């Protein structure tokens, strides 16, 4: 089977099922008479920009990192430029002050991006607290934001 068709099937499986392991993709492909190795599936995953994200049940499952995340990144850039008043940082914490009524939007966009340096957001009316695991993770987030704003 051609690579394009196999990858199309993989994308379909990722959309239809909660796939935790590459071996599950190998099994699903085999049911469609597509015999491949785990190494081939691994390469396909990389080429398709699949990434593991937490499911609602807390499992780490493959999802397609594509237009949806790209659009969120674009929205965050636009919103940050429009509403951010000030950013302050201390240790692993980043406080983003926004125009009134806009902090929650920033928090939602941060959550949708699922950046690994961020472990959580708490937002009020005009303040969004971004929490990182460490000071170095917070510094990475700060660099990203400074490039955007």
Swiss-Prot record:
Question: Where does it primarily localize?
Answer: cytoplasm
Question: What single Pfam family name could you report for this chain, choosing any that match?
Answer: Arg_repressor
Record carries keyword Iron-sulfur: no
Entry's transmembrane regions: none
Q: Which SUPFAM superfamilies match?
A: C-terminal domain of arginine repressor, Winged helix' DNA-binding domain
Subcellular location as annotated = Cytoplasm
Quote the InterPro entries the UniProt record gives: Arg_repress, Arg_repress_C, Arg_repress_C_sf, Arg_repress_DNA-bd, WH-like_DNA-bd_sf, WH_DNA-bd_sf
Q: Which GO terms describe its cellular component?
A: cytoplasm
Q: Which Gene3D superfamilies match?
A: 3.30.1360.40, Winged helix-like DNA-binding domain superfamily/Winged helix DNA-binding domain
Q: In which pathway does it act?
A: Amino-acid degradation; L-arginine degradation via ADI pathway
Please list the GO biological process terms of this entry.
arginine catabolic process to ornithine; protein complex oligomerization; regulation of arginine biosynthetic process
What GO annotations for molecular function exist for this entry? Answer: arginine binding; DNA binding; DNA-binding transcription factor activity
Keyword annotations from UniProtKB, A to Z: Arginine metabolism, Cytoplasm, DNA-binding, Transcription, Transcription regulation
Function noted in UniProt: Regulates the transcription of the arc operon, involved in arginine catabolism.
**Family per record:** Belongs to the ArgR family.
User: Would you tell me the protein name for this molecule?
Assistant: Arginine regulator
Organism of this sequence: Bacillus thuringiensis subsp. konkukian (strain 97-27)
């Amino acid at each position: 089977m051609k690579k394009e068709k196999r990858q199309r099937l993989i994308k379909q499986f990722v959309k239809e099922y909660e796939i935790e392991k590459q071996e599950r993709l190998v099994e699903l492909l085999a049911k469609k008479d597509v015999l491949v190795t785990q190494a081939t599936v691994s390469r396909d995953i990389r080429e398709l920009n699949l990434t593991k994200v937490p499911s609602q049940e807390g499992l780490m499952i493959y999802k397609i990192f594509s237009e949806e995340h790209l659009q969120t990144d674009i929205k965050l850039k636009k919103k940050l430029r429009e509403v951010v008043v000030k950013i302050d940082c201390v240790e692993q914490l980043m406080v983003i002050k926004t125009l009134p009524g806009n902090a929650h939007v920033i928090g939602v966009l941060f959550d949708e991006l699922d950046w690994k340096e961020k472990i959580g957001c708490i937002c009020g009316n005009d303040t969004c607290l971004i929490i990182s695991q460490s000071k170095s993770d917070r510094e990475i987030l700060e660099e990203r934001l400074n490039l955007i704003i």
